């Protein structure tokens, strides 16, 4: 009996410990949820859907446009909108990362929703895996080709077409079906495309008064073209500008096929045109872009302070703000100041700094302030510049508080914020007080702050060199 009593006593003494352990274990996930719930709460946030629609609504309303994308964030939200929401099913979204594969080219050659097949006329054997994965660019062959045309003009035209450097002839005679496999190449680094002027006028693109006879595509700096690039050229050769083609602004320059100068921005997409828009002094179709941003774009409730915006969403918010600034700058350049001011004010309304902080680099916020200054809205400019300056001061102050090893590892970042603070101070100094005509107080304040912090930097540098 005594042993039974001892066993009972042990069990009773262990029971509170077990209960306590259970309570502690239950508290751990509760603590985790309470601390991280807001970081994962996506309720009320529609940025993914709306920003995807903004890409789709950046392209022309008619003509069954093709929109080239490259990554995840500029592709899957677009597919979701088309597949689930039924938005802009006339647009063919073409992901360049997949365009290197035969199965995806098969898909592109089939209709989808309200979009006809893309203008790729190659037989499957020409693009099946292992065929035309890459074709070399051989500009050194140009002289030999020209000599062949001089010496044997009829035979040359029969084999390579009237112009061996015209895009259609290069694709047909040099890339797809050369008589000699050793001739499979692109025999020039300067391709031409014969232009149908009437088709261009019908296309809806912003065109100059004088349309040239040819479009020039430079391949300088390229030694090889990969299958996806050949497919872009194939589409360019066959679309005849009546099927609008666009490149999402998030596609990197490496995938631009040296067509960057031919781009004309209309929103979150560049329209591919046959013109050198840099030479024409324009990179934006301001009328189309204004209409898209002001009347078609949605912003997924990012102005709601109760909605959590993570790093990825903030990056896309910065992209949208930057796009507004680019539009406003172009409108100012064109003398359309009323529209420029409306665009900037609307940007501040739908992408407020209370939820999407102004950023010197990512948001083009300094350029936004400069636009406001040009429009005579100095108070609005000062507010933005003060936010940028204050942010830089906080970062520099923090970097200067680090120990020697940490500071040494962070030196470049610290100097970057010194540069930002200095640059913002210069812009603030351009704003004069409306009553006194003198430099505004915030310019003096942040200039003094810069000098104080720079003295601390010099002091730290001297201490470090002495050690």
Where are these regions (language model features)?
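Alpha-helix capping/helix-boundary segments
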Residues: 73-74
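ER/secretory pathway lumenal C-terminal domains and tails of membrane proteins involved
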Residues: 3-64, 79-467
